[in-house]
Structure formats: structure tokens, C-alpha cells
Amino acid sequence: YPNITADFAIDAPQGWCHPVEVDFTDQSDLPSSPTPQYFWDFGNGATSTAENPTQNFYNFSNTEDSTYDVTLEVTSYDCKDTLTRQVTINHNPIAKFDIDRTEGCTPLTINATNQSTGQDASEWRFDDGSPYASGDSTTHTYDNTTNSVKPYDLELYVETNEGCDDSTDVRLNVYPEVTADFDIETPQGCAPVVTGFTNNSQNADNYNWDFDDGLTSSQVEPLHKFTNTSKHDTTYHVELISSSAFECVDTITQPVKVNAQPQAEFTITQESDL
């Protein structure tokens, strides 16, 4: 009978990262008649009698590659030959990181630590136009120049030397900046000074006024009376603390000068008769 030689080719069109669909193509040297018999043992508990089978292979490890011994046995005229080749399924890394905060007022600085497994390279992607960064940790500052909440997605991409990859991301919410500002209708005058305040604060919801005389207010634009019973001019330092519903805060202080009222005073000196 003619001599037969078992042979086959292996192809994984989608690559060798878990899970892998592998195509096996018979390339044995054997007579075409009678019809040869094929028996495939894929080394994973599965078998096949097809000439050119397809088989799925898995690797549930995140750190080590898995190798399977695939054996083809061909039979013709009761003559047999076998060939064993190895199939290696590369592991997939798992992307994971810890982050110290996911929300806050602009500028928001975050610190993230890489907790991934099985990777050979890591890449931090910031979603704000900044260049990607590598390494086991990253510190990044996010800005928000709008008047509404601005979201960013911080992504960690990891990859092995074989090209197997994974990624994970977390949503960050950066709250708008609060700017405290106000104008004083009467910044200086003779006691008493009654003045209103024009509130020019931006992105604020709550206001706390301290008039530096023991009195406070939470009105948006309060009216206040400043007194001065001394003989000297007095300056009050008015403080406005503006805050948002997101607990973003800004403070500004401006002076109100209250001049002392002049006091008329004279003395009479009795003179002798002229």
C-alpha cells in the first residue's frame, strides 16, 4: 500500500487571544482512494472526524498562556500515521485601577493606581485632549470652564506583548467653578452708612455675608446699615462666601469705610468787664 504521511496546517483568523476559533486544514500525503479516515484529538476533551475541522479553545487564566496538544490520525488501506502540533492560547489581561475621587470642583486633581493583572504595558487615556500616559499610577488635573457639570471618562488600556488587551474606565464629574464677586453701592460715607450690595457671583446657589460688625445675612443682595459712634473713621471688611449645590466655594472681601460724624463743640470763657 502507498505510504501515508499525516500533516495539517493551523490558522486562527481572529488572533490567538482567548477565546480562539482555530481552523485546521488537512495537508496529509495519502492516496485519494479509498476515502481516508480522519481522527482529531484537540487536547481539550473534544474530538472530530472531519477532514478540515474548526475548534474553539479557551484560556481562563489572566496571567499564563495555555498550550494544547492537537493530534491528527489519518488512516488509509489500514495504514495509519499521526502528527501532533501544539496550539498556544494567549491569556487576556484584566484592566483595573483604583482612584481617590470621581467628582469635585474644578480644577479636579485625581490620583489613580493601576491594579491590573497579566499586562506588559499600560496606557492612561484622559478624555480631555491630553497626551496618553504610561506607568503604574497617574496624577491628572481636569478643568471645567463651563457653567454646568462636565463629565470625563478616565480609561486604562492594558496590553500583552502578544497583543491581547483589555480596558476599563470610570466616569468623572467636574463641577463648575464658583466665582464670588459683588459691588458696593455706597463704599464710603458719613455714619451711619446704609448701603446695598449687587451680587455678581457666578455659578453659585448660596450666599453668606459677614459685615464685620457681628451681623450676617444669607440674602442674595442684602441692605445693611453700618454705624460709627467713635471719633475716628472705621473700615468694615465685608466678606461674601458664595457656594454651589456641589459645595464649590469662593470668597471675596471688600471694604466699607464709615467716616466719623463731626461733633460741634465750643467753650465760653468769662471775661472781666471792660
Spans of features found by a protein language model:
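Extracellular/lumenal mature domains of secreted and surface-exposed proteins
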Residues: 1-274
